[in-house]
Amino acid sequence: MDHIQYAKNVLDEGTLNNLQQFCLQHYEEIPIYNFARKTEKPKNYLEEVIRDLIGYDNHLEYWVRDDTQATLMHVDANELQAKIDRYKYGEEDPHMIKEFPLNTHILYVFIDPKMEGGKLLIMPEQEYIPGRKILDTTFRPAEGSKIMVVKPETNHMVLFDKPLYHAVETVTNTDVVKHRCALMFSSWKKI
């Protein structure tokens, strides 16, 4: 499974502390979707951290999620266009051309060691199924499908370079754990 990689101790202690402080204290101020062209210098701390990790070879999409709720099984793609279609027309255009990033990175910024649940689920053998919607609330893994389970840990990162279906479980002990903070970013060849 060369298309899925896992790294530990991704950031040095100072960078990690600064990133945690920024994401946890300013989460509400961070736009939901962010994009940076490969020719642009970083406009903010998040872009600085990401560019230090992956360089400037490709365009960059990134977002932060500090949430204890589940996300449905999905693939990373041109979701923004699908959301615009839903807003304008009430549904995703079934004929919309699906575009996928070169890769997806999930950097765990802050994970409480007491967290129960909140695991990342990846279907390592299931790429996007042509004809399905990007924002597909009806997708369910077929019985017997292989699912890789990743227990998030602070300063660890998961990377995959195929449009794989993935999801996040609900954190089950939200009486104790208030944050499950991750920085996600994807490289794009074209805009």
Feature-to-residue mapping (PLM):
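Non-heme Fe(II)/2-oxoglutarate
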Residues: 1-80, 84, 119
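Catalytic core of non-heme Fe(II) oxygenases with the double-stranded beta-helix
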Residues: 59-61, 65-191
